[in-house]
Amino acid sequence: MTPSRITILAPGLIGGSVALAATRAFPKAKIILWTRRSESIPALRSALPKAEIGTEPSLIAGSDLVILAAPPSALVPLAQNILPHLAPATLVTDVSSIKGSVEKSLAPLFQKKARWIGSHPMAGSEISGFAAARHDLFQNAPVILTPTPTTSSDTLQDATSFWKSLGAHVLTMSPTEHDTQVAQISHLPHCVATALVLTAGTRALPLAGSGYRDTTRIAAGPAELWSEILLENRSDVLTTLKEFQGSITRLAHAIEQKDAASLKNILQEAAQIRRSLSHS
């Protein structure tokens, strides 16, 4: 896909990074930025001087690609506002880390109005907002596309082509499978990092080295967004938390029983799995 007019709605960290990356990947394309807050326009214009920026949903008219970069709770009203300005050939996607509920909400709205497919870039930072956006955020990062049985092959192909143009590694799975796996690989780590920070408290912070900092970095993420994500995906998150409790219990039991062999096996099993990530 070589889009000529790309609109990003609500450009924060992810949406802003899409805009910066797309400017480089598609130098001939017109970049459109929609923001609900007029006070954010100067910063957007400073970073993307050639972009068209405004607060009116009509900005998206004529776009062949539209990226919804708002939080999950804002997606439905945002989608409803842009519907009159879409064309049947327009490719519309999002960047939400939840897919089941988003698919159920948005797919019916876009039916016959545009070509819809869900996207989730597995890239980000504990720092939110457009100021943290980077043109290279998606380089070698996984982006998950969540087609359904009604998704056309052209829609999947065009979405895949777009994200690959930004440097991403594209994976496909169903919205349900996405939510299950992301609960394990993204949502659980945020819960664990939060629990670790709360358990350690502040007394030992002067001793914190790279291990603690690396392990807890994501706990500094925006609480409002993460509470929304965890509650939206609560079924899969709760299942994963229970599995994690089982792993903690297994580890604690080996330590309590002074079972060096079992403890070593647990640590080696985890180390082997983690090392496989380095080679993938």
Segments from the language model and where they lie:
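Internal alpha-helical scaffold of NAD(P)-dependent oxidoreductase catalytic cores
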Residues: 135-218
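NAD(P)+-binding Rossmann beta1-loop-alpha1 motif at the extreme N-terminus of oxidoreductases
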Residues: 1-57, 61
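Interdomain hinge/lid region at the active-site interface
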Residues: 203-273
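Residues at the starts of beta-strands that form the adenosine-phosphate
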Residues: 5, 30, 115, 142, ...
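Glycine-rich, N-terminal phosphate-binding loop of Rossmann-like dinucleotide-binding domains
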Residues: 69-71, 96, 147, 195
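Rossmann-like NAD(P)(H) cofactor-binding subdomain of soluble oxidoreductases
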Residues: 78-131
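Rossmann-like NAD(P)-binding element
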Residues: 58-86, 90-91
